[in-house]
Structures are given as structure tokens and as C-alpha cells.
Amino acid sequence: MAKSNYITRAGWQALDQELKYLWKEERPKVTQSVSEAAALGDRSENAEYIYGKRRLREIDRRIRFLSKRLEALQIIDYHPQQAGKVFFGAWIELENNEGEINQYRIVGCDEFDPTKNWISIDSPVARALIGKCVDDEIEVQTPTGKAVFYINKIWYDTKSLY
């Protein structure tokens, strides 16, 4: 399945900051250390030189990825018409059949974070939630079988969007 190109404004800004940091701070530091290591002589057994070149390739790879990805991403901002329904950027409180309650936020695939309960728009749960309202029921196929969830609450964190 192809990754979606949606991202929150805060997520786009975080990726942009990472790109700027890598380009303006990290890469120059590593380039300087590689130059210093190269000046020491034999490069074939120079661990600092070899490690520095490897790190420089990793940084360049990440810079290329971020540059292309940021161009392709589409920032999705909250719109008042979304109130009451689940759309991109929504926080949702779900309850399962056992009465367990969890809260999730639907974000882009570049910013999903299980430790924050941020789920990707491309995930089966998020796809089932899109367009639903409070008190709706969704059914999702999980590795252990079908799971049913009830939507208790929907809200948008409009303060962190800008």
C-alpha cells in the first residue's frame, strides 16, 4: 500500500527543522571531523575517517529523503466543518467490548508515534474511523480476529496546529 502524503502543520515543521539541522549543523561538523581524520594519514585503517565517511553518507541520504518528502507532503489543517466527525488530525476516544478506553490521534505516516498514541492515516483503524461520528461503531480486522470499537469522543487540538 502506498503511503499517503498527508501531514499536520506541526509534523511538517518538525521534518523541516530536522532537514535544516542536518544541513546547517550536523553535516558541517561531520565534514570537519572527516577532514581532520583524513589529514592524519593512512585512511585505510583510520577508524575515525571510515566512520565519518559512513556517517556523512547517512546524513546525505536523510537530507535527500527529507528534501523530496517535504516537497511531496500536503499539510492538512483543521477546518471548522470537521467538528463532530473523524478526519485527519482528530483525537478519538475509543472503547472496546471489554470497556477499555484508549485515545488516539490520526496523523500522517511520517509522524505516527505509538508512544503518543498517534496512529497513521494509512492504518486499518484510522481508515475505519474516517467520517464517523460519536456513538458510531467500527469493526477492524486484527491479528486475533475482528475487534469492535465504539467512538466515545472526538476532538481537534487546534492550539497545536499553528
Curated annotation (Swiss-Prot):
Coiled-coil regions listed in the entry: 52-76
Task: List the InterPro entries.
Answer: GreA/GreB_C_sf (IPR036953), TF_GreA/GreB_CS (IPR018151), Tscrpt_elong_fac_GreA/B (IPR028624), Tscrpt_elong_fac_GreA/B_C (IPR001437), Tscrpt_elong_fac_GreA/B_fam (IPR023459), Tscrpt_elong_fac_GreA/B_N (IPR022691), Tscrpt_elong_fac_GreA/B_N_sf (IPR036805), Tscrpt_elong_fac_GreB (IPR006358)
User: What SUPFAM superfamilies does the annotation carry?
Assistant: FKBP-like, GreA transcript cleavage protein, N-terminal domain
Return the Pfam families for the record: GreA_GreB, GreA_GreB_N
**Which GO biological process annotations does it have?**
DNA-templated transcription elongation; regulation of DNA-templated transcription elongation
Which keywords has UniProt assigned to this entry?
Answer: Coiled coil, DNA-binding, Transcription, Transcription regulation
What GO molecular functions are on record for this protein?
DNA binding; RNA polymerase binding
Physiological role: Necessary for efficient RNA polymerase transcription elongation past template-encoded arresting sites. The arresting sites in DNA have the property of trapping a certain fraction of elongating RNA polymerases that pass through, resulting in locked ternary complexes. Cleavage of the nascent transcript by cleavage factors such as GreA or GreB allows the resumption of elongation from the new 3'terminus. GreB releases sequences of up to 9 nucleotides in length.
- Tell me its family: Belongs to the GreA/GreB family. GreB subfamily.
The protein, known as: Transcription elongation factor GreB
